[in-house]
Amino acid sequence: ELSLTTFPSYKESINDWVNGQRFTLKQLMIYDRLNNETLKEIISEVEQRFGANDSSDKAFDELFKLIFTKLYDEKISADDADAISNQMRYGNKSLKEIDDRQFRTLEFRAKEQERADDVYKNISDLYERAKKKWPGVFPSNSKLEMQKATVKSCVKELQNVKLFNSNLEVVDEAFEQLVNKGQKGDMGQYFTPRYVIDMCVKMLNPSPDEKMIDTAAGSCGFPMHTIFHSWNILNPNKDNLFTTAKRTQREEDYVKDNVFGLDFSEKSVRVGRMLNIVAGDG
């Protein structure tokens, strides 16, 4: 189901018209599954679809690649996110009233009638672009190492989920579900609730000219919320949480020069590195 962007022409078949409907960031916000479901539930469904065709041993790495790619697809629609925010804030428009005809079409999609080979190629190409945009999370020669049918079924589950939201809780839910719980328990790891992190950061009240290091950073909750806190000081009237909004050079420099995190878990390091790179845009 989509909010209509065009009407069919008199020469156009219904099937051609349906297939030609664009899915933009506006559509994603309207039909976001997180309006009615939790990400843990959705990720659990994705894991089941993955396990139906592929080995569960590589579920974390492969689903991590898909989430990484999905975040990239949302991030490169940053101009559209800014337009939506401005029109809703200053133009007093509702989301459905916003004209999205000039918006970018999202690419992390899989239509029901689309061949699995075509979906795999499209998502693989998007993944390659994401790696070039955000190097250091995955090896440059890494590929999607799952069945093509698995890619299609997992993309269908994730495509109507808006991962960039006002806080890290949404993405944290995804990775908490994916990270091997047995391994976490053996090493005494856990995910600190975000409201606890928010409280601690507000109590410490870090300033943009201070440096911080977390020597057991895990998925980088404390470093990320320190970043958000300092960004809010640098630009108090700007959206400063986990959004697709563009960052100023000063904000990016603060992340690169002042915030550091360490951890002995390879999985946690990769998750934390990705969140820092994505939220700080490099």
Model-found features: residue ranges?
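Conserved phosphate/pyrophosphate-binding and hydrolysis machinery centered on Walker-type P-loop NTPases
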Residues: 53, 57, 144, 164, ...
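Long recognition/docking surfaces used for binding and targeting
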Residues: 68-180
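Short, basic/polar, glycine-containing "phosphate-handling" surface segments that engage DNA
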Residues: 1-58, 149-165
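Active-site-adjacent bridging/hinge elements
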Residues: 33-44, 171-177, 246-247
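Residue-level detector of well-ordered alpha-helical segments, enriched
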Residues: 58-63, 67, 150, 170, ...
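Short, polar/flexible loop-turn hinges at active-site or ligand-entry regions and domain interfaces
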Residues: 50-55, 77-82, 185
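Short, hydrophobic/amphipathic alpha-helical patches that form generic packing surfaces
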Residues: 61-74, 274-278
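Conserved S-adenosyl-L-methionine
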Residues: 186-282
